[in-house]
Swiss-Prot record:
It catalyses: dUTP + H2O = dUMP + diphosphate + H(+). The gene is dut. One of its GO terms (molecular function) is magnesium ion binding. Belongs to the dUTPase family. This is Deoxyuridine 5'-triphosphate nucleotidohydrolase.
Amino acid sequence: MKFFCKLESGSSLPEYATSGASGADVRANISEPIAILPGQRALIPTGISVDIPHGYEIQVRSRSGLAVKYGVIVLQSPGTVDADYRGEIRVILANLGESTFIVEPGMRIAQLVVAKVEQVSFVETQEELTATARGTGGFGHTGEC
């Protein structure tokens, strides 16, 4: 399947690092380094716009290496790029580490994962919802079933 991309000057197509990779790496399309202080965030351009077919989305996800080595993650991960969006994909990076992180021009900053999506009809009901072992247990309750 092909997704057609429009590239700004200096940007490059997303690339899969291996034949089994789920996420395609995207790079920072910046001319100068950007410093992200500990506890801060920055919106980093990629220079990529994508013609996403109806029924698909692109999820923007953290790169595991940046997360484990530096504490740098994609905020709101996964971020969603909807099929009807045609603007530039930009990445919100957050520095959860203890040191300033420098985003260099051309650095791999995130991964794009293509996923099928389906819109459904949400219907209000006054009936009880189907019973499950988990029931109404929320955050932290999946291991208690």
